[in-house]
Regions:
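Conserved structural motif at the start of ABC-family nucleotide-binding domains
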Residues: 2, 17-19
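The feature captures the beta-strand-to-loop junction immediately N-terminal to the Walker
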Residues: 33-35
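Catalytic Walker B motif of ABC-type/P-loop ATPase nucleotide-binding domains
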Residues: 149-153
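Conserved ABC ATPase "signature" region
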Residues: 94, 104-121
Length: 223
């Protein structure tokens, strides 16, 4: 479980969260919804240890964890594709794998690559389609065998087949780790979510989810 308590965060003197309390359960996939600027990416970066809260505590499985340890616990997949374009898929994998304390085995890499339909890993990233780059991005996030997997809009702007490949793998990964994901696609919510959390002040997502009779938790900057 990840537990956030009394989190305050400002960005450029603008309040994002005042006193946020939120929990994420292990072995579940939680989707964060909210308008642009609501703080979804900031929240993911705070949980990942990439940004500090101005106030409050975040605990992981009951403990406060140093940033160095978080690097070993968390697989973080940013919205921007974080790959070396001039290198092949395998070279990218080997480069990022070398940074992991306890990386997954080559057999597991092959298994994930197969599930993502990454057939030719000798191709330079620069020659890949946007959807294939996104799939490699997700695979890189799994190299450390993370207890927590965090994905910031991992399927934005890609084709339906690539989205399906990523969804299939994430649904299998739910049994192994805690997953947090942001998206703007309601079909992605339906395909993946065990829990739904809505942040921000725009009523759009709340109204749509109510119409669909889906259960969700709501948070605004005062929470």
């Amino acid at each position: 479980m990840i537990k956030l308590q009394n989190i305050k965060k400002e960005y450029r003197r603008k309040s994002i969260f005042e006193s946020l309390d939120m929990t994420f359960e292990d072995k579940q996939l939680t989707i964060l919804l909210g308008e642009n600027g609501a703080g979804k990416s900031t929240l993911l970066r705070m949980i990942s240890g990439l940004e500090d809260a101005d106030r409050g505590n975040i605990t992981y499985f009951g403990d406060q964890v140093a940033k160095k340890q978080l690097q070993d616990m968390i697989g973080y997949v940013p919205q921007d594709i974080a790959l070396f374009e001039h290198m092949s898929v395998n070279e990218n994998i080997n480069c990022f794998k070398a940074l992991c304390k306890n990386p997954i085995t080559e057999d597991t890499i092959d298994q994930y690559a197969s599930q993502l339909h990454l057939a030719d890993r000798t191709v330079a990233v620069s020659k890949l389609s946007g959807g294939t780059k996104r799939k490699v991005n997700v695979l890189i996030g799994l190299l450390s065998n993370p207890q927590i997997l965090i994905l910031d809009e991992p399927t934005v702007g890609i084709d339906l087949k690539s989205r399906y490949d990523i969804h299939s793998l994430l649904n299998k990964m739910k049994a192994q780790c805690l997953i947090i994901l942001t998206t703007h696609h309601l079909d992605e919510v339906e395909a993946l979510a065990d829990r739904i959390k809505v942040i921000g002040t725009d009523p759009f997502y709340r109204d749509v989810l109510k119409d669909k009779q889906w259960h969700f938790d709501t948070y605004n900057k005062q929470n």
